[in-house]
UniProtKB/Swiss-Prot annotation:
Gene from which the chain derives: yqhP
Subcellular localization, as worded in the UniProt entry: Cell membrane
Protein name: Uncharacterized protein YqhP
Basic residues bias (residue ranges): 66-92, 122-131
Species lineage: Bacteria, Bacillati, Bacillota, Bacilli, Bacillales
Membrane topology: Multi-pass membrane protein
Length: 131
């Protein structure tokens, strides 16, 4: 990318670097104090923003958390069923002759996916002239 730095931005960066070096050389204690102040202010702002964002999420955030929890629980149950069905099986890498007759194939029932109905404009007629 050939983006050219604006002259005003370059001057501000140069002045900031010069001021940083000047304070670092002349008064390093004050520099450390300013750094701690900036870090503490940043942490306070971060937690305020995080708190406000969590409050604004409201019912949508709660619904999402509930759906995620249900999904995790359902996946654990499916994995437990899957593992229980495969415990007695022999790996496909080993060839073990079977003494008994082969078992009939069991058809696995597909699990229903959880779908959400989105309400919309169902009665609106399509303009067939555009097709």
């Amino acid at each position: 990318m050939n983006h050219r730095v604006q002259p005003i931005i370059a001057v501000l960066i140069a002045l900031g670097a010069f001021g940083f070096l000047y304070v670092l050389v002349t008064n390093p204690g004050e520099m450390a104090k300013m750094a701690v102040t900036v870090i503490v202010a940043g942490i306070i702002i971060y937690f305020i923003v995080k708190y406000v964002m969590n409050r604004n999420a409201g019912s949508e955030g709660a619904a999402f958390k509930k759906a995620a929890k249900q999904s995790r629980r359902r996946m654990k149950e499916q994995k437990a069923k899957h593992r229980a069905g495969h415990k007695g099986r022999v790996s496909h890498l080993r060839s073990v002759p079977s003494a008994s007759k082969p078992k009939p194939m069991i058809l696995k029932k597909k699990s229903q996916t959880q779908l959400t109905v989105i309400e919309g404009k169902k009665n609106k007629k399509k303009n067939r002239a555009l097709f």
